[in-house]
Amino acid sequence: GSGTEEDPYLIARPSQLALLAQCVNEQTAGYFEPDVHYLLTADLDLSGYENWTPIGTGPQDGRYPYENPEKAFQGVFDGGGHTVNKLNVAYTGATTFTSVGLFGVNDGTIRNLHVAGTVSATTSCTDKSYVIAGGIVGFNIIAYEDAMNTRPGSGAIEHCSFTGSVSASCGNDPT
């Protein structure tokens, strides 16, 4: 495919999904921008990936993802009703921001996807750090507005499900 809505990039193998994560996280031109379309064309088994690298990351400078969404997934990912099986994310580290799942940070659209697996994140947190975990998406950036704040965002998760376990903790304090 060419990445358009009419001709999306096709993902049929786990290695292609891993390449998507790499391209988004490294901001490879033509793959991480808004409105790039992807279509999952088969069920995937990620058992060959001992520790999955989430698609889309957040800032590492203490800001929240919506304050700096450049490395978030911003495209359209259509799971085509398929399942990503045996997801394993086991993050342990010390960063200012940790968000894990099949997608780490989403500011695009993820739809028609089923995920099964285990997601866990453990980090040493301070007042300027946090950890977030989810099966499909760790942090979904959505628009927000109230009397004092306006925040842009276009993250959407539609017709998706997760089966498995999710856990996150800051040091010895599970959240």
Model-derived segments and spans:
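Surface-exposed repetitive/solenoidal architectures
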Residues: 1-175
